[in-house]
Design a protein with these regions (language model features):
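Non-catalytic, topology-defining segments of multipass membrane proteins
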Residues: 1-38, 73-156
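Acidic (Asp/Glu-rich) catalytic motifs at the cytosolic membrane interface
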Residues: 42-61, 82-94
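Post-HEXXH active-site segment of zinc metalloproteases
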Residues: 58-73, 102-103
Length: 156
């Protein structure tokens, strides 16, 4: 994909998030659907950040770096720490002692094995706040303003 397509996708995702937040503030009936929309766009941004981390979004490393920051910012994720975490995952892929993603899964295994139907909606909305914080422990986040505001709004 060309530099422009990745940048355009990032801009569109940011605009969808901003529009959804704005419309939800004026029309409360849109809050629940808005959670799904914002969740899907945050997931899309994380994919853009991941691809930029591998320098796949552009042949220019500086553009990839900026795309990482713009993609990871609403997630509260530091691109530098994400790269460290993610590249360790690639280096130790599947190793139960060294792969950070495997270690994370083992840490929350009890919670997943006792998964209830009522948690499905929370998973779809991304509202498992304590698990999100656990993941952030591994990737060393800097809480962004957008992330903090969204999480506080969800917890109220």
């Amino acid at each position: 994909m060309s530099n422009t397509k990745w940048t355009l996708r990032l801009i569109v995702d940011w605009l969808i998030i901003a529009t959804t937040i704005t419309l939800s503030s004026y029309y409360p009936v849109l809050v629940i659907p808005g959670l799904f929309i914002i969740g899907s766009r945050l997931q899309a941004l994380s994919i853009i950040g991941h691809m930029a981390c591998h320098n796949f979004c552009s042949t220019n490393k500086t553009i990839n770096k900026y795309l990482q920051y713009l993609a990871f910012y609403p997630l509260g994720v530091s691109p530098t720490r994400y790269k460290k975490f993610h590249f360790a995952h690639h280096r130790w892929l599947g190793d139960p002692q060294k792969d950070p993603e495997v270690l994370l899964q083992l840490e929350v295994k009890d919670r997943w094995s006792k998964h209830r139907k009522s948690d499905l909606l929370l998973d779809l909305c991304g509202i498992h706040y304590d698990e999100i914080l656990q993941i952030f422990k591994y990737i060393g986040t800097k809480y962004s303003v957008l992330f903090t505001v969204c999480m506080q709004a969800l917890l109220v």
